[in-house]
Amino acid sequence: MEDFVRQCFNPMIVELAEKAMKEYGEDPKIETNKFAAICTHLEVCFMYSDFHFIDERGESIIVESGDPNALLKHRFEIIEGRDRTMAWTVVNSICNTTGVEKPKFLPDLYDYKENRFIEIGVTRREVHIYYLEKANKIKSEKTHIHIFSFTGEEMATKADYTLDEESRARIKTRLFTIRQEMASRGLWDSFRQSERGEETIEERFEITGTMRRLADQSLPPNFSSLENFRAYVDGFEPNGCIEGKLSQMSKEVNARIEPFLKTTPRPLRLPEGPPCSQRSKFLLMDALKLSIEDPSHEGEGIPLYDAIKCMKTFFGWKEPNIVKPHERGINPNYLLAWKQVQAELQDIENEDKIPKTKNMKKTSQLKWALGENMAPEKVDFEDCKDVSDLKQYDSDEPEQRSLASWVQSEFNKACELTDSSWIELDEIGENVAPIEHIASMRRNYFTAEVSHCRATEYIMKGVYINSALLNASCAAMDDFQLIPMISKCRTKEGRRKTNLYGFIIKGRSHLRNDTDVVNFVSMEFSLTDPRLEPHKWEKYCVLEIGDMLLRTAIGQVSRPMFLYVTTNGTSKIKMKWGMEMRRCLLQSLQQIESMIEAESSVKEKDMTKEFFENKSETWPIGESPKGVEEGSIGKVCRTLLAKSVFNSLYASPQLEGFSAESRKLLLIVQALRDNLEPGTFDLGGLYEAIEECLINDPWVLLNASWFNSFLTHALK
């Protein structure tokens, strides 16, 4: 048992448990069951508090990927696991600051949200018996009791379970795993029987009256009484043959558990078909910026003024012509739309006072591009319910697409460093409590690694475009407003810089519901010749609009400048999430933090500094056909950030489905790598669920191809 405890629990927990036992003069080598029980209890207390924070409004939130600007403090103070003197000091200080009644016994946690101490119990017996013993022992109305059992049951004061379903499920799953691990080593029975009750024991707890009637009413079918059901449950040992257990539970279930071996999994089948095309709302690696440094012009910061100033930095405009038509669109209209933008910007400059916003004339080309008057007329259901052949349109299945090489190039580009900084140091939220100097140190190191990353540029560009579009959609519902696509950054020398990527013209936007769509036409500058990868640009009409002089090693060269024009659409809810893209920074920071935590618990000290400053060490970044790719810690930060940003840019139902379903297969494969001898049933069904999400989405197809590389290397 002692070996099992040392293997199964985090070294920090084991050390705390040993300390606690020594404090009471007990020997972990002799009282091994108690050793295991203390470790389990400690782990449950820590899991209880994990990820739970309080934001600046005093609301409780769960942060696994939260808002980077939130001022967060931990929701729970952990008292369990501190030495007695320290623990009482913490309790006293909480009582002094909050005015809560001082408990007689040391509780396990304090909840800053509900302002109460919590006693956590983990029992190998029945939860309500253990609950009563606890309640009798502490005899305090004020301390909240929450009991978990190894069978997945729980009981809490006034049925108030404090935490959300998912957090409690994590704890129950962990307890169940510990139980299974013990059972598989033949340690469970002695552990289960070794539990002694609390000091004040009330013998057999009788349920009477209303509670008894409710208990009898709520039994599963085929059980005559509560005793009868209890006896059945007590005899239900989880280890052993699952098929038998399933058939015991239901006549309809006949699952054959198949062992999952190295040879079992096959690669995911990626769809065949023409290569997939770019579907992001704005250009990524192909974008070109017209920039002004140290902007100080009149009206600086007003998007339209900034845009006109940026446009004036370029002198190579020429008569536009179409170099790659859109397959299905009326291409001359796209050409006319760009000419109209140029003409109307020229008109603005000829006015005495430049307006703050510009509404475009409703020309026929813009009406066509923005789908004006194209929506079918809505008819009240009452007026047509008698129509005999009323039916929904038949919609075509989406056409399957194959993975194209451009998707991996886009991702690689997103991980690279640019020569500008896109976020300030405090972009990922501020310090809240003094304890958080470690957190702020981590945040600063992390920010330094990602502030120049191209993925960070995409975040700021996404936040700007979505904010501007949502704003215009509400403020100018009927107008075709011209919205410049702008971002701001700092150069290496710390000079401010304003960049213009192109323009958006928004259509009518009477957005009543979150999912109502606003159409827009985007026009974006680029130096990429669309004829090199025409499949990537099938949704675009591309014009050649000028020649740009570029400084290169061999002197100045002239390159054609292109304009990528397309019609697109978005909704209130998508724009709302687009404005929240900074969350990607926090999500990737937290992934890095969990790597640091793992390292710190092995070394038993905070490893933040070493982690970021030891430049020689390499870390696994991902799997490619060549094997496991490794890189510096900065590269890991940027890769995690790029993944998070692409999940936001390419969010789709296909991605949701693929992530959820492939995760199940991933867990099975990891269990196999950890020699846990996993078994599965209906593996074919799981593959089907994963593969029905592989249709045509570029980001999902790339993830599926990475998944296949992972399978290959994981099963070698």
Curated annotation (Swiss-Prot):
> Which amino acids does the record list as binding Mn(2+) 1?
H41, D108, E119, I120
* Motif segment (Nuclear localization signal 2 (NLS2)): 184-247
Q: Which Gene3D superfamilies match?
A: Influenza RNA-dependent RNA polymerase subunit PA, endonuclease domain
Q: Name one GO molecular function term.
A: metal ion binding
Tell me the residue numbers annotated for binding Mn(2+) 2: E80, D108
> Known post-translational modifications?
Phosphorylated on serines and threonines by host kinases, including human casein kinase II.
State the Gene Ontology BP annotations: cap snatching; DNA-templated transcription; symbiont-mediated suppression of host gene expression; symbiont-mediated suppression of host mRNA transcription via inhibition of RNA polymerase II activity; viral RNA genome replication; viral translational frameshifting
User: Which Gene Ontology CC terms are recorded?
Assistant: host cell cytoplasm; host cell nucleus
The Enzyme Commission number assigned here is 3.1.-.-
Q: Where is this motif: Nuclear localization signal 1 (NLS1)?
A: 124-139
Instruction: Using the UniProt record, name the top-level EC class of this enzyme in a single word.
Output: hydrolase
Function according to Swiss-Prot or TrEMBL: Plays an essential role in viral RNA transcription and replication by forming the heterotrimeric polymerase complex together with PB1 and PB2 subunits. The complex transcribes viral mRNAs by using a unique mechanism called cap-snatching. It consists in the hijacking and cleavage of host capped pre-mRNAs. These short capped RNAs are then used as primers for viral mRNAs. The PB2 subunit is responsible for the binding of the 5' cap of cellular pre-mRNAs which are subsequently cleaved after 10-13 nucleotides by the PA subunit that carries the endonuclease activity.
Q: How does it assemble?
A: Influenza RNA polymerase is composed of three subunits: PB1, PB2 and PA. Interacts (via C-terminus) with PB1 (via N-terminus).
Which protein family is named in the record?
Belongs to the influenza viruses PA family.
Q: What name does this protein carry? A: Polymerase acidic protein
The organism's lineage is: Viruses, Riboviria, Orthornavirae, Negarnaviricota, Polyploviricotina
Q: Gene name on record?
A: PA
